[in-house]
């Protein structure tokens, strides 16, 4: 799969990526890859930008290109005037660059751990301590929900700026402003 990802990155084609969770897939453009993780700019089914995802390549089971779905999505994104994102500048690997961007930008993240197929953590990255990551968690209503610590190596995927994260983040800001 690493060679396939590298080829798609060079071709800059819109693609659909399937992982161990057979119920879902993501569609968009690959922005970067380091052989372990790939960075993908996502679009929702209506052609709107849906954030960035850093995905462990080993979790990818299938990649599709040139499908009717992908062609329609590309048309819709153009129709909606969606502009392409630049890749995140990095010194080290893709995951570290993504985490640094999340920390610096105070971005609400959704994290899947150990290919669980679930949103295991939703929150703000507050600290990077070697291999350990500290997140201030929020629930789906934008309310604080404690803190969690886990190792970066447990991350299957992490994303930010999707519609879901933007909604939860907005609720958090609106509720925090009331206090």
Where in this protein do the model-derived segments appear?
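Short glycine-rich, low-complexity segments
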Residues: 1-25, 39, 43-118, 139-179
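Short aromatic-glycine-enriched beta-strand elements
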Residues: 37-40, 132-136
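Short beta-strand-centered aromatic/proline hotspots
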Residues: 26-32, 120-127
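Short, solvent-exposed coil/turn segments at beta-strand boundaries
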Residues: 31-36, 57-58, 128-131
